[in-house]
Amino acid sequence: MVGYFPPLVEQVRQVGLPLTVVELDERWLQQDGQFEVTLEPEKLNDCSKIICTGTVLVNQTIDGLLPCFRNASQIFIVGPTVGCLPDPLFDRGITRLGGCSVLDTVQFLGLWTAQEKWRASTRRYVLSRDSTYPGCSQLLNNATRGLNN
């Protein structure tokens, strides 16, 4: 995993699966049996599944991490900061993106401004490289056809 995401870390630990988390913030560093939080991305080389928080897109660390994902069959980037077209990421080997879209803007802004949890005002989604996602080019073609009709 890239990025210490406490709710997800707890879910994985409760199941008892081995988990390595790469983090930039030293205050999260720890090791306990099959669980480790490290500063060393190379420790992901042997992982078969990788989950990254969307922060890897925001802080532009994804390119430096990709070589460490080469043995992973599944690579996910998840979180509210993943609202982007997936094509360039799919082309680089990312298999799924999970994000959220705002359903109720007024409710969302009220909750966000009050620094409260805003999940109730959003809907989660997953885009998969192997799904029916048509690709950016096809989306643009469809939009252009719609404008010309």
Regions found by a protein language model. Give the residues of each.
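Short, polar loop motifs at secondary-structure junctions
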Residues: Y4-P7, V22-W28, P80-C84
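C-terminal functional extensions of proteins
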Residues: F76-N149
